[in-house]
């Protein structure tokens, strides 16, 4: 059985994938001990909302107090880069293949969805974290909340 080769993902498409992954991942408290995504997604959303005003404030404040332009711009660029780092990490995580322990769990969740009568598309190649996020989102919508207890 040959798996299709995945081409490397471009640097800029990782940001779009990270945004999609953040929207897809179910933010359930029961997933937090196993997956770090809950914390990263919350921190990234917070940074997207807070860092642009902080960058503008620090830029204006340093210039108004007679500071030099170079450090002011560097501080503003650093503040603006924080949400981008979160999106980049999420994008990189979304295309990472699942490790064997989580892969077994992924197939168990898919099996529970199929037992419940849900039609699922076949998995192509090795599943990644985006496929896990899609499956978990669907499981949280269509299965009862106790499906995680059995796994």
From Swiss-Prot:
It is a multi-pass membrane protein. Belongs to the UPF0208 family. The lineage of its organism: Bacteria, Pseudomonadati, Pseudomonadota, Gammaproteobacteria, Enterobacterales. InterPro entries: UPF0208. It is found in: Cell inner membrane. This is UPF0208 membrane protein KPN78578_26420. The chain crosses the membrane at residues 46-65, 69-91. Pfam families: DUF412 (PF04217). Keywords: Cell inner membrane, Cell membrane, Membrane, Transmembrane, Transmembrane helix. It comes from the Bacteria. One of its GO terms (cellular component) is plasma membrane.
